[in-house]
Amino acid sequence: MLISARRLRRCQSLQLLASCFVLSLMALLVQEDNSLVNHVKSYSYRYLINSYNFVNDSLSVPRDRSDGAAGYRYLINNRHKCLNEDVLLLLFVKTAPENRRRRNAIRKTWGNEDYIRSRYAANIKVVFALGVERDPVKSHHTQQDLVNENKRFKDLIQQDFSDTFHNLTLKLLLQFGWVNSFCPSAKFIMSADDDIFVHTPNLVTYLKSLPIETQDFWIGRVHRGSPPIRSKASKYYVPYEMYPWSSYPDYTAGAAYVVSRDVAAKVYEASQTLNTSLYIDDVFMGICANKMGVVPQYHVYFSGEGKSPYHPCIYNKMMTSHGHLGDLDYLWRQATDSNVKSLSSGFLGNVYCKIVNIMLLCKIGYVDTYPCSAAWS
């Protein structure tokens, strides 16, 4: 009994010493602009951010003072896109006015509604969300091009805010406001950048497998305990007066994520009483969701910043891949080839693809797209 008591006191002493060491180290480095230190501090802080309401309270504004997207008028609006239809997935593509080539490439590949309807018996709707050309010299000509483009494809949603990086939160509010007003019956809503490849067949198959009344659903590449960037040289710079806390609430990368319709409604509701000056849209999305008690779920095949490895064993499970401009057509043909499924089918196929995926995703220093854990899923 005496030995046990001594061991207990020794363990307690070691824990106390370790805690003092960590606290002392953090105190010494607190003034350092060190990325690793900032991440350690912010990740330690994330429990408070995710569990309590002081962040939401500090960013809240009265509803009548909200400066959201409701104050901007629609210049182009396809309000009947979802009318009287049972929509499985409403897919918003965030785009810029000048990116017509990207939009055309998406329409022919992963955003092809007719292809998904005929091959997978699923009704998806793809719309492009954008603001207005920021260059006044080009604005009139560009706007006329957009009007003509929409006459042909009927898939643009545009409001009259300037289409800039610092207005991405307005583009987020445009999306969720449009869902709330014109497509509230869509079961799932996706937001994606226009340089993303979305494996819509895999995504649709996955969404169809979920329970009919799936709720509180939010999947993507989750960032946990991310610190605000305080360097003015970064385009992600956020000053203390805009966001004073050491960590953001958990959120999914804005490049691509999917939510259920109840989450879309909750985010829209929360956005009506939050200060929208925080221009990093995926962080603002996390703040809205946190206010409503919605937690993001990490999906290993939603990509990070880099491109997915080009291999059939990856295509079989991929959901998104980032950074695709000139290769969408090639990747679409490769990823949807009928031989992809047959290659990984059966016991030997599963073993083969498991080995290949481990070799592709578990290399030391490889952090571009999917985590090593994806190889084992």
Swiss-Prot record:
Q: Name one Pfam family in it.
A: Galactosyl_T
Q: Which UniProt keywords apply?
A: Glycoprotein, Glycosyltransferase, Golgi apparatus, Membrane, Signal-anchor, Transferase, Transmembrane, Transmembrane helix
Protein localization: Golgi apparatus membrane
Please give, as recorded in its UniProt entry, the membrane topology of this protein. Single-pass type II membrane protein
EC numbers listed for it are 2.4.1.206
- Intervals, Cytoplasmic compartment: 1-13
PANTHER family from the xrefs? BETA-1,3-N-ACETYLGLUCOSAMINYLTRANSFERASE (PTHR11214), LACTOSYLCERAMIDE 1,3-N-ACETYL-BETA-D-GLUCOSAMINYLTRANSFERASE (PTHR11214:SF21)
Q: Which reaction does it catalyse?
A: a beta-D-Gal-(1->4)-beta-D-Glc-(1<->1)-Cer(d18:1(4E)) + UDP-N-acetyl-alpha-D-glucosamine = a beta-D-GlcNAc-(1->3)-beta-D-Gal-(1->4)-beta-D-Glc-(1<->1)-Cer(d18:1(4E)) + UDP + H(+); a neolactoside nLc4Cer(d18:1(4E)) + UDP-N-acetyl-alpha-D-glucosamine = a neolactoside IV(3)-beta-GlcNAc-nLc4Cer(d18:1(4E)) + UDP + H(+)
Please identify the protein, giving its name as recorded. Answer: Lactosylceramide 1,3-N-acetyl-beta-D-glucosaminyltransferase B
Function description: Beta-1,3-N-acetylglucosaminyltransferase that plays a key role in the synthesis of lacto- or neolacto-series carbohydrate chains on glycolipids.
Residues of this chain annotated as glycosylated in UniProt? 56, 167, 275
**Similarity field:** Belongs to the glycosyltransferase 31 family.
Which ranges of this chain reside in the Lumenal compartment per its record?
A: 31-377
Q: Which residues cross the membrane?
A: 14-30
- Gene Ontology cellular component? Golgi membrane
Q: Per the UniProt entry, what are the Gene Ontology biological process annotations, in alphabetical order?
A: protein O-linked glycosylation
Lineage of this protein's species? Answer: Eukaryota, Metazoa, Chordata, Craniata, Vertebrata
Any one GO MF annotation of this record: lactosylceramide 1,3-N-acetyl-beta-D-glucosaminyltransferase activity
Task: Name the enzyme's class.
Answer: transferase
Please give the pathway this protein is involved in. Answer: Protein modification; protein glycosylation
